[in-house]
């Protein structure tokens, strides 16, 4: 699997993420699932799929019996809506900025093929020093992402919900 990751990532600089999935009933049939760094939603273009497929086809790259098929990871869209409740002496704008920086960092790190979005991670990212309470309105629960998908955040709306 690591060799396929290496050759897929080396094929083109636009390859962002890669998962290698082997079918239980036919372990020689491999799905090479990639995402694209410069596409709007992370899905790979047909051109990139062909470039990576060509890079994996030569027999010196793969075992003779392996049959790798390059596929695009499918974007699983979600949005984040949250309210932050601050202390009486807190500087709202600074706390909001810090929470937004941390949630954007989490979104970038989580944009991996097969990476689920966990509410606990969202709470952790949003709960910066000075925030008393975080209420996440969306997503309502964990977002389960399978090996053929990657999470794609379409919008974030983080606001100050009040003073406590």
Where is each model-derived feature located?
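An aromatic-glycine-centered, glycine-rich loop/turn in mixed alpha/beta architecture
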Residues: 95-164
């Amino acid at each position: 699997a690591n060799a396929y990751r290496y050759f897929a990532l080396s094929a083109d600089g636009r390859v962002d993420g890669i998962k290698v999935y082997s079918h239980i009933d036919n372990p020689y049939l491999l799905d090479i699932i990639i995402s694209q760094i410069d596409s709007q939603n992370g899905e790979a273009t047909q051109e990139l799929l062909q470039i990576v497929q060509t890079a994996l086809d030569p027999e010196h790259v793969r075992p003779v019996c392996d049959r790798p098929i390059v596929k695009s990871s499918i974007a699983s869209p979600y949005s984040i809506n949250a309210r932050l409740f601050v202390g009486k002496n807190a500087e709202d704008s600074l706390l909001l900025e810090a929470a937004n920086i941390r949630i954007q960092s989490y979104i970038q790190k989580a944009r991996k093929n097969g990476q689920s979005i966990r509410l606990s991670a969202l709470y952790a990212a949003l709960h910066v020093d000075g925030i008393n309470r975080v209420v996440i309105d969306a997503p309502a629960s964990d977002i389960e992402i399978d090996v053929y998908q990657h999470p794609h955040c379409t919008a974030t709306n983080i606001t100050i919900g009040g003073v406590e």
